A protein has these predicted regions:
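Membrane-interfacial helix-loop-helix junctions in multi-pass membrane proteins
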Residues: 102-118
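Transmembrane alpha-helical segments in integral membrane proteins
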Residues: 119-144
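Juxtamembrane non-transmembrane "cap" segments at the membrane-aqueous interface
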Residues: 75-103
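Transmembrane helix boundary and interhelical junction motifs in multipass membrane proteins
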Residues: 34-47, 51-77
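Residue-level signature of transmembrane alpha-helical entry/exit and packing/kink sites
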Residues: 20-24, 58, 116, 120
């Protein structure tokens, strides 16, 4: 069984109301796509316990930001942040090709661009709220559909 099927199966079998399950999942998505890289799991566990949310649903939401989404998501989030608050003074964004990701020069350049942290933070915060707002009704619909069929 694939990872995605196992995750969906776990979410659907959570012994809770569809609303609480969907809310927990949406909060997990909010945390999982937040700008706090490296803290997502700890934050998910803490929030689930602190607010007595469904822990399985929260963690599945947190882990929906899988490793292969990190670079595309946070790149897009930085772009969104730049569109919202503007490009910091003195920063010039070059055209980047996919093949550049495999060049040492690109990573050296990227490491010197710490001024992009604020746009990345703002962009990922905005996108995580949007994704959570989409996740709640979607998860609610799926869980209700499953529970009515069982």
């Amino acid at each position: 069984m694939s990872y995605l099927r196992k995750a969906i199966s776990s979410l659907l079998k959570v012994p809770d109301t569809p609303e609480r399950t969907a809310f927990g999942f949406a909060i997990g998505v909010l945390i999982g796509f937040s700008p706090f890289l490296g803290l997502h799991t700890v934050m998910g566990v803490a929030v689930a316990f602190l607010f007595r949310l469904n822990k399985i649903a929260v963690m599945l939401g947190v882990w929906s930001n899988v490793p292969w989404l990190v670079i595309p998501f946070y790149s897009f989030a930085t772009w969104v942040g730049v569109k919202v608050i503007g490009l910091p003074e003195g920063i010039h964004l070059p055209s980047i090709e996919f093949s550049d990701l495999f060049r040492t020069e690109f990573w050296i350049w990227l490491g010197s661009q710490w001024q992009l942290l604020l746009p990345a933070f703002i962009g990922s915060l905005l996108l995580s709220v949007i994704l959570a707002a989409i996740a709640y009704p979607t998860a609610l619909w799926v869980v209700k559909k499953y529970k009515s069929a069982v």
